[in-house]
């Protein structure tokens, strides 16, 4: 694909598997019942898609569609080889900046966007997925706002026969799945000493942590959100976190994801009183700290972020994951751990001539947003 923005399109490794054209099939599902009908196959495909993140799990997408989806807008592209599902693009029709586009399901609540792709069938699956999308009428561009390095979406972009654009997007911060002492060793000696003293303070207080079982996960998320809102009382908070649809989506998704080992809801108790809770998403390679809440006065007693980071690191090691992702944002409370920054990209795949104007507008708005947030020119060159 021709790419805007310069640079080489990064992608996960491609493996060629020859299969007669007659053994391939592709379609775009518009019937919202199709999402539920493909549940088992989408779960299986996720397991075979090493680049996918928890935001591409069936449970996350189905719960989101149930509370946010608009009837008639689903565009779920699927590819089969010899009858087996080997690729899927969970998209929906929408309008951005006045342009008709296809966007990922749950984009507003997800830190990463991607397609599902079985690497055994990469070349053929990408080719047929591309053709199925281009044959679908009524849109000028696919707009993927948060694409991780090495994502399947980069493979699709690399083979896209029409114009494709990239622009820098959010920064995500990552730590290796080491013990908390190893993380503290990354800090200046005096700072590390203070953090170790804070850990001893947590332990002396006897704060315990429990991973909630699947049958309690939904209720636990409702409690977590109450703690989250109490924690932010009197300060600006994401308005979506106050809405019933967000609460319902998160609770429903968590129940299925905890059951399948794709998430954990951690509850912290002090003298048997619930004082904090943490929703951690568990991907193929990383665990991601998605949302937490704590009673307001807990910060006066212990370092809450340190307490949760220690447990998230332990969870990553227990699940044999490479590390902990602090997900989007480079806030100071994350940067103090000296994590590795990983830059997402916005990938735009053009279909018709207006895509160029859409991409130019999107890139301009991204630069202006970057200046507002960081007081410097945008990172895009």
Predicted regions and their residues:
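Short, Lys/Arg-enriched N-terminal segments with co-localized hydrophobic residues
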Residues: 1-8
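Active-site/acyl-donor-binding loops of N-acyltransferases
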Residues: 10-32, 149, 153-182, 319-381
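A conserved beta-strand-loop-helix scaffold within acyl/acetyltransferase catalytic domains
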Residues: 24-104, 146-170, 180, 185-300
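Aromatic (often tryptophan-rich) hydrophobic motifs at membrane interfaces
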Residues: 79-80, 105, 110, 118, ...
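Short, solvent-exposed beta-strand edge segments and adjacent coil->beta transition regions
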Residues: 110-112, 206
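Active-site phosphate/ATP/adenylate-binding loop shared across adenylate-forming ligases
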Residues: 115
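ATP-hydrolysis module of ASCE/P-loop NTPase motor domains
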Residues: 134-151
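Short catalytic-loop micro-motif centered on adjacent basic/acidic residues
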Residues: 141-144, 210-211, 323-325
């Amino acid at each position: 694909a021709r790419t805007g923005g310069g640079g080489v399109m990064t992608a996960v490794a491609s493996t060629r598997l020859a299969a007669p054209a007659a053994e391939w099939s592709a379609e775009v599902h518009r019937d919202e019942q199709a999402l539920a009908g493909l549940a088992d196959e989408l779960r299986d495909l996720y397991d075979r898609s090493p680049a996918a993140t928890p935001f591409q799990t069936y449970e996350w997408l189905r719960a989101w569609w149930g509370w946010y989806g608009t009837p008639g807008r689903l565009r779920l592209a699927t590819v089969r080889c010899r009858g087996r599902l080997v690729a899927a693009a969970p998209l929906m029709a929408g309008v951005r900046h006045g342009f008709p586009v296809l966007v990922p399901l749950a984009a507003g609540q997800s830190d990463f966007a991607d397609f599902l792709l079985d690497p055994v069938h990469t070349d053929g699956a990408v080719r047929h997925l591309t053709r199925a999308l281009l044959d679908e009428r009524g849109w000028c561009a696919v707009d993927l706002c948060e694409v991780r390095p090495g994502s399947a979406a980069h493979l699709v972009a690399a083979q896209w026969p029409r114009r494709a654009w990239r622009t820098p997007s959010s920064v995500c911060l990552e730590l290796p799945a080491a013990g908390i002492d190893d993380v503290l060793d990354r800090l200046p000696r005096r700072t590390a000493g203070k953090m170790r003293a804070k850990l001893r303070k947590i332990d002396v207080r006897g704060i315990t942590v429990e991973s909630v079982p699947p049958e309690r996960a939904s209720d636990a998320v409702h409690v977590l959100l109450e703690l989250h809102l109490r924690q932010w009382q009197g300060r600006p908070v994401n308005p979506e976190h106050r809405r019933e649809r967000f609460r319902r989506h998160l609770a429903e998704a968590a129940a299925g994801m905890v059951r399948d080992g794709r998430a954990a809801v951690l509850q912290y108790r002090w003298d048997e009183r619930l004082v904090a809770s943490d929703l951690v998403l568990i991907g193929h390679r990383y665990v991601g700290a998605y949302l937490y809440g704590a009673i307001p006065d807990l910060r006066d007693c212990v370092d809450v972020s340190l307490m949760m980071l220690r447990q998230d690191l332990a969870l990553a090691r227990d699940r044999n994951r490479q590390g902990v992702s602090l997900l989007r944002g480079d806030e100071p409370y994350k940067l103090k751990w000296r994590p590795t920054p990983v830059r997402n990209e916005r990938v735009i795949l053009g279909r018709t001539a207006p895509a160029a104007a859409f991409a130019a507008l999107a890139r301009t708005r991204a630069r202006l947003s970057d200046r507002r947030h960081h007081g410097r020119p945008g990172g895009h060159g």
